[in-house]
Amino acid sequence: MLKTLPPTLREKKRYVALEIIFEDELFQKDVIAIVRNALMNYSGVLGCSKANPWLIDYNHPYGILRISRDEVDNLRSSLSLSNEHRKKPINIHIIGISNSVKHIREKFLHVPHEPYYKVIQKLKKKGPKR
Protein backbone atom coordinates (compact mmCIF):
# COMPACT_ATOMS: atom_id res chain seq x y z
CA MET A 1 0.00 0.00 0.00
CA LEU A 2 1.28 3.44 -0.92
CA LYS A 3 1.79 6.07 1.72
CA THR A 4 0.55 9.61 1.22
CA LEU A 5 3.13 12.30 0.62
CA PRO A 6 4.05 14.49 3.57
CA PRO A 7 2.99 18.14 3.25
CA THR A 8 6.55 19.29 2.58
CA LEU A 9 6.74 17.20 -0.60
CA ARG A 10 3.29 18.00 -1.98
CA GLU A 11 2.71 20.43 -4.81
CA LYS A 12 2.15 23.98 -3.57
CA LYS A 13 -1.16 25.40 -4.82
CA ARG A 14 -2.81 28.79 -5.15
CA TYR A 15 -6.45 29.55 -5.75
CA VAL A 16 -7.44 32.29 -8.17
CA ALA A 17 -10.80 34.11 -8.17
CA LEU A 18 -11.88 34.94 -11.73
CA GLU A 19 -14.55 37.10 -13.28
CA ILE A 20 -15.29 36.29 -16.91
CA ILE A 21 -17.00 39.01 -18.91
CA PHE A 22 -18.68 37.47 -21.96
CA GLU A 23 -21.95 38.26 -23.70
CA ASP A 24 -23.30 34.68 -23.46
CA GLU A 25 -23.49 32.47 -20.39
CA LEU A 26 -20.57 30.07 -20.11
CA PHE A 27 -20.61 26.57 -18.65
CA GLN A 28 -17.81 24.85 -16.75
CA LYS A 29 -16.48 23.01 -19.80
CA ASP A 30 -16.25 26.33 -21.68
CA VAL A 31 -14.26 27.95 -18.86
CA ILE A 32 -11.89 24.97 -18.71
CA ALA A 33 -11.35 25.20 -22.47
CA ILE A 34 -10.72 28.96 -22.29
CA VAL A 35 -8.14 28.64 -19.49
CA ARG A 36 -6.33 25.70 -21.10
CA ASN A 37 -6.26 27.34 -24.53
CA ALA A 38 -4.93 30.58 -23.03
CA LEU A 39 -2.14 28.71 -21.23
CA MET A 40 -1.34 26.59 -24.31
CA ASN A 41 -1.15 29.64 -26.59
CA TYR A 42 1.04 31.59 -24.16
CA SER A 43 3.40 28.98 -22.72
CA GLY A 44 2.85 25.79 -24.71
CA VAL A 45 2.17 22.25 -23.58
CA LEU A 46 4.98 22.20 -21.02
CA GLY A 47 3.83 25.44 -19.37
CA CYS A 48 0.23 24.24 -19.24
CA SER A 49 1.24 20.94 -17.65
CA LYS A 50 3.43 22.72 -15.08
CA ALA A 51 0.59 25.09 -14.19
CA ASN A 52 -1.84 22.18 -13.72
CA PRO A 53 -5.03 24.31 -13.92
CA TRP A 54 -8.12 22.89 -12.22
CA LEU A 55 -11.52 24.56 -12.07
CA ILE A 56 -12.84 24.27 -8.52
CA ASP A 57 -16.12 26.15 -8.85
CA TYR A 58 -17.90 28.23 -11.47
CA ASN A 59 -21.14 30.19 -11.25
CA HIS A 60 -21.45 32.58 -14.18
CA PRO A 61 -19.53 35.00 -14.25
CA TYR A 62 -17.35 34.09 -11.23
CA GLY A 63 -15.08 31.10 -10.78
CA ILE A 64 -12.33 29.62 -8.64
CA LEU A 65 -9.30 28.09 -10.32
CA ARG A 66 -6.54 26.03 -8.66
CA ILE A 67 -3.05 26.56 -10.07
CA SER A 68 0.52 25.65 -9.17
CA ARG A 69 2.18 28.29 -7.00
CA ASP A 70 5.14 28.77 -9.33
CA GLU A 71 2.93 29.41 -12.37
CA VAL A 72 0.65 32.18 -11.03
CA ASP A 73 2.40 34.92 -13.03
CA ASN A 74 2.25 32.76 -16.14
CA LEU A 75 -1.51 32.30 -15.66
CA ARG A 76 -2.07 36.04 -15.12
CA SER A 77 -0.30 36.99 -18.30
CA SER A 78 -1.89 34.26 -20.42
CA LEU A 79 -5.43 35.13 -19.25
CA SER A 80 -4.87 38.82 -19.84
CA LEU A 81 -3.77 38.08 -23.42
CA SER A 82 -6.79 35.91 -24.17
CA ASN A 83 -9.39 38.14 -25.83
CA GLU A 84 -11.62 35.96 -27.98
CA HIS A 85 -13.83 32.88 -27.54
CA ARG A 86 -15.98 31.55 -30.38
CA LYS A 87 -15.17 34.69 -32.38
CA LYS A 88 -16.72 36.90 -29.69
CA PRO A 89 -14.80 39.24 -27.38
CA ILE A 90 -14.02 37.98 -23.88
CA ASN A 91 -12.39 39.63 -20.89
CA ILE A 92 -11.03 37.63 -17.94
CA HIS A 93 -10.44 39.63 -14.78
CA ILE A 94 -8.46 38.12 -11.90
CA ILE A 95 -10.11 39.33 -8.70
CA GLY A 96 -7.61 37.87 -6.27
CA ILE A 97 -5.23 35.07 -5.34
CA SER A 98 -5.08 33.14 -2.08
CA ASN A 99 -3.85 29.83 -0.71
CA SER A 100 -7.24 28.68 0.59
CA VAL A 101 -10.63 28.27 -1.04
CA LYS A 102 -12.35 29.53 2.09
CA HIS A 103 -10.45 32.82 1.96
CA ILE A 104 -11.19 33.25 -1.76
CA ARG A 105 -14.94 32.76 -1.22
CA GLU A 106 -15.19 35.07 1.77
CA LYS A 107 -12.84 37.90 0.78
CA PHE A 108 -13.05 38.13 -3.00
CA LEU A 109 -16.37 36.54 -3.99
CA HIS A 110 -18.30 37.57 -0.83
CA VAL A 111 -19.94 34.15 -0.58
CA PRO A 112 -20.12 32.27 2.73
CA HIS A 113 -17.88 29.22 2.68
CA GLU A 114 -19.63 25.88 2.48
CA PRO A 115 -17.87 22.63 3.46
CA TYR A 116 -16.84 20.63 0.41
CA TYR A 117 -18.84 17.53 1.32
CA LYS A 118 -22.06 19.59 1.32
CA VAL A 119 -21.26 20.93 -2.15
CA ILE A 120 -20.78 17.38 -3.45
CA GLN A 121 -24.08 16.27 -1.88
CA LYS A 122 -25.90 19.13 -3.62
CA LEU A 123 -24.31 18.27 -6.96
CA LYS A 124 -25.33 14.62 -6.64
CA LYS A 125 -28.94 15.62 -5.95
CA LYS A 126 -28.93 18.18 -8.76
CA GLY A 127 -27.45 15.91 -11.44
CA PRO A 128 -24.58 16.43 -13.88
CA LYS A 129 -23.78 19.87 -15.29
CA ARG A 130 -23.49 20.55 -18.98
Curated annotation (Swiss-Prot):
User: Cytoplasm: present as a keyword of the record?
Assistant: yes
| Transmembrane annotation, as ranges | none
Localization annotation: Cytoplasm
Cytoplasm in keyword set: yes
Highest taxon of the lineage = Archaea
The alphabetized list of GO BP terms reads: tRNA 5'-leader removal
Q: Which UniProt keywords apply?
A: Cytoplasm, Endonuclease, Hydrolase, Nuclease, tRNA processing
Give GO MF terms, alphabetically. ribonuclease P activity
Instruction: List the catalysed reactions.
Output: Endonucleolytic cleavage of RNA, removing 5'-extranucleotides from tRNA precursor
Q: Which InterPro entries match?
A: Pop5/Rpp14/Rnp2-like, Rnp2-like_sf, Rnp2_archaea
Q: Name one GO cellular component term.
A: ribonuclease P complex
Q: What Gene3D superfamilies does the record point to? A: Ribonuclease P, Pop5 subunit (3.30.70.3250)
Query: What are the EC numbers?
Result: 3.1.26.5
Q: What class of enzyme is it?
A: hydrolase
Q: Give the record's family classification.
A: Belongs to the eukaryotic/archaeal RNase P protein component 2 family.
Q: How does it assemble?
A: Consists of a catalytic RNA component and at least 4-5 protein subunits.
PANTHER family assigned to the protein according to its UniProt record, in alphabetical order: RIBONUCLEASE P PROTEIN SUBUNIT P14 (PTHR15441), RIBONUCLEASE P_MRP PROTEIN SUBUNIT POP5 (PTHR15441:SF2)
Role according to the record: Part of ribonuclease P, a protein complex that generates mature tRNA molecules by cleaving their 5'-ends.
What name appears for this protein in its UniProt entry? Ribonuclease P protein component 2
- Organism for this UniProt entry: Methanococcus maripaludis (strain C7 / ATCC BAA-1331)
Gene encoding it?
A: rnp2
